[in-house]
Amino acid sequence: MEQQKKNIKRYTEEEIEKAASLDIVDYCMQNDIPVKPDSERYYRLTEHDSLIIDRKKNQFYWNSRGVNGNIIKFVQEVEDASFPGAMQRLLDGEQDYEKASEITFVSEPYDYEHFEQKEVSRFDRAREYLIEERKIDPQVVDALHNKGLIKQDKYNNVLFLWKDRETGAVMGGSEQGVVKSDKYKRGAWKSIQKNSTANYGFNVLNGEPRNLKFYESDIDLLSYATLHKHNLKDTHLISMEGLKPQVIFNYYMKACERIGDVPDSLSLCVDNDKAGKAFVERLIHFRYEKNDGSIVAFKPEYPQAPSEEKKWDWNDECKRVAKQQEQREQGRRAAYLQQRGMER
């Protein structure tokens, strides 16, 4: 007994504070504890819906058991861990949990009218950028512009409007500059409009949302649509504007409500890189049962990276395919001209 006591690690106040600062919802996401959002702030466990998580306070309340507390207490209660066991799991060096203090909440509602004033009727610069620079299919660009999903502002930025597919309301927006400059970290202006509604993103619905596909960016979404435009029946394409599981679960719940069943497929069309693969690992263990008893799980759908590339996204793939097509066309044109010359 004395030896067991000696083997129990004692944690410092700093370590306890560090553990307590970690976000409960992110811990759940990374450890296959299914949660569902009631709102931006409140979540509940799927298997114990009387357990509510207040993400803003980073506290949980298990109403049926009369238990509440911070993330350390959460791990003890939900995973039946001792205090040292909970601390060990939270401070595991292989996991990188978000800090609760870094989770942002919208304090003011999104005001589309404010941003709408910057929109212009012309679409020339935005269209040219998407087609010539990003190699997006002109038919895809024009179709989405005609639907009011992609526009141009007075600064010539491309505007991606985040529309709610049920109400038609604009929930937020993202902006992509068309001029390269060294003063921008990513080479060009890129921004999410202020107070854009949490858990939404740029999205395109073709038919019913029976197949959900999630992307890291608006451009990746358009690139995928370019490469697979003939195979998108009953498909909802959604940009997470990064790697955000909250966006995924929001649109998953909306799809279930609309079709009255679990979607037929859930695809994570993320970058083929370390971060994208780590994100997939967080979600592939979730299982959902359809009305007919079949099981649906998240599946990765990476762009095929060349062997020498450590990072490859869907726009990289779109550009690669476009270049191959251009080279084939040049080859055919050269062969045709050569043949004409021989005939003369």
Swiss-Prot record:
Residues 323-332 have a biased composition (Basic and acidic residues). Keywords: Plasmid. SUPFAM superfamilies: Zinc beta-ribbon. InterPro entries: DNA_primase_Znf_CHC2, DUF3991. GO terms for biological process: DNA replication. GO terms for molecular function: DNA binding; zinc ion binding. It comes from the Bacteria. It holds the Pfam family Toprim_2. This is Uncharacterized protein pXO2-78/BXB0107/GBAA_pXO2_0107. The keyword Lipid biosynthesis does not apply. Residues 323-344 are annotated as: Disordered.
